Regions:
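Conserved N-terminal beta1-alpha1 strand-loop-helix module at the mouth
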Residues: 2, 12-112, 121-146, 190, ...
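Conserved functional loop/turn residues at catalytic and ligand-binding sites
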Residues: 55, 102, 145, 153, ...
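A short acidic, helix-capping loop that chelates divalent metal ions and anchors anionic groups
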Residues: 61, 98, 155-161
Length: 233
């Protein structure tokens, strides 16, 4: 008779294989999170198009200001854009919008819907990301069906000034504690991304490091190159 540990290992292997059908670990290398604050006269669509041209591997639409009708319209347009580049596209927090416009998935925080409830709503084939700051949160999110974790803030960030920083030691401990991919988020830039080498993350999520730059495509290319080097180090 097989031990509980062996059964748990097989279940995790099956889960990981299923996750790989929805997305590859490499898709999380450079994860762009949109922010209307950095539009500077441009449209969100044009900004996302530029970062996709530069090689962004994953896009999250984070929208706190639009009403539902405009949010839905914008989400559908950006989903089609991401599909042209074969880049996964998820919605931040708003699971109902993700369901209605058939996004590739959703990303939720600790104060949002639990991962298993998101899974029940979106179905087995959608990507579910969960934010975590502790090993306990990370392990629980994995058990509840998360496909990947966003951990941070790893550096100080003005976009979420009230969020406590996650130490390098905690980031590494989280990566060691789970079998699903982990990305770091919060205050990451081309100047400090190399400091995350050796933690076990498979990529980074950024906002201003891409969208606050004058040349979004060039900034994306540079950051992707540096992140690739960091992950391999």
């Amino acid at each position: 008779m097989r031990s509980d540990k062996e059964l748990e290992k097989d279940q995790m292997k099956e889960k990981t294989e299923h996750m790989c059908k929805k997305m590859k670990k490499e898709d999380l290398l450079l994860y762009a999170v949109t922010d209307r604050h950095w539009l500077n006269g441009e449209t969100l669509y044009s900004q996302v198009e530029k970062t996709l041209e530069g090689g962004t591997t994953f896009v999250q639409l984070r929208e706190k200001e639009l009403d539902e009708a405009h949010f839905l319209k914008e989400a559908k347009e950006i989903k089609e854009l991401c599909a042209r580049y074969r880049v996964p596209f998820v919605i931040n927090d708003n699971v109902d919008i993700a369901l209605e416009m058939d996004a590739d998935g959703a990303h939720v925080g600790q104060s949002d819907m639990e991962a298993d409830d998101v899974r029940a709503k979106l179905g087995p084939d959608k990507i579910i990301g969960v934010s975590a700051q502790t090993v306990e949160q990370a392990v629980l999110a994995e058990k509840r069906g998360a496909d990947y974790l966003g951990v941070g803030a790893v550096f100080h960030t003005d976009s979420k000034a009230d969020v406590a920083e996650v130490s390098r030691e905690t980031l590494k401990a989280i990566c060691d504690a789970v079998d699903i991919p982990v990305i770091a988020i919060g205050g990451i830039s081309k100047e400090n991304v190399s400091e995350l080498a050796g933690t076990g993350i498979c990529g980074i999520a950024v906002i201003s490091a891409i969208f606050a730059e004058k040349d979004i495509k060039k900034a994306t290319e540079k950051l992707k190159s540096l992140t690739g080097e960091m992950v391999k180090a």
